[in-house]
Amino acid sequence: MYDARQLYDHLQVAEQDEIPLRPDERLRAMNRPLLAWYEEHARILPWREEPQPYRVWISEIMLQQTRVEAVKPYFERFIKALPDAAALASVEDDRLMKLWEGLGYYNRARNLKKAAGIIMEQYGGRMPSEYEDLLKLPGIGSYTAGAVASIAFGEPVPAVDGNVLRVISRVMASREDILKASTKRWMEECLKETMPKERASHFNQGLIEIGAIVCVPNGQPKCAECPLASVCLAFKQGSTGEIPVKTPPKKRRIEERTVCILEHGDRVGIKKREDSGLLASLYELPNVEGHLKPEELAEAFGLLEGAVEKITPLPEAKHIFSHVEWRMIGYRVQLKKSIPQEFISAQKKELEQVYALPNAFGRYTKLIN
């Protein structure tokens, strides 16, 4: 097992305290003020009102890469439609994608369904209660396994996400790169050793909460409001703006695309993407690489000569993925005849009720009326 003492040796820094604390003492000194603060300041959130294992799991997956306020309505809609693992395991893929539409990172939803199938087959429809078993489910890493195990089952394991990495890095004045897996591993081991075993749920949620609303990123922490200020080395040293340290992200590839709203009466042409790759298996508005001129559209989208009634330019749009940035121009193409057979001819109301179109096309789907 990893020796958490390596962290303590590594983090010996110049103390500003009158009586210096050992690193493990500093972490233990957080516990009481953290728990007291959380009990008083915890936000009221729908998944906290009933912290059942399934609900905790769904909320934690949704909260990956997505803000709390944005998740709330999606969570309530999802739970209403798919209230348990049995419903999730049996839902049709298109229905699942529609429920997830707007949250992005659609592999999260696919992994939820895969995991639900395993829960039904191997665990009798009940969420596994132990960290190591949770870790075996698709889409669940150390953070999510720790969150579900501690919040839903009280297991004394840490849940270290980006918020916690930031808080602990500042408390310890650590200059370790928080994007390195090794940094996360030693932080997990250290917290596992020092966290209050009987209060694991509130401890983990409290750390996450402080990181979300007090110890915020980009050099703007609210130190005057922080219950950990008295033990925080970065605060004492005036280095909160420099911590945490993380590797600058790689530059995204720029990709130009042309998007078309193909219309005939109350119908719109859409396509289903390939089963693998970016936005796999989702529906999309017709689009091609490059920025095309109006006279190039018919050939690019396989439209017959004389099929176009009118072409109207639409506003430019941009969508950022983790590794690529789409810079789009758009056109509304009104057709004289029906939607070509190579496209799905969808009624406009079906775009709201049936087909899941990713946020990448949001600027243009809002213009369909």
Q: Where in this protein do the model-derived segments appear?
A:
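Intrinsically disordered, low-complexity, charged terminal extensions of DNA damage-control enzymes
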Residues: 1-43, 49, 212-369
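Catalytic cores of DNA base-excision repair glycosylases
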Residues: 14-28, 32-33, 37-224, 228-237, ...
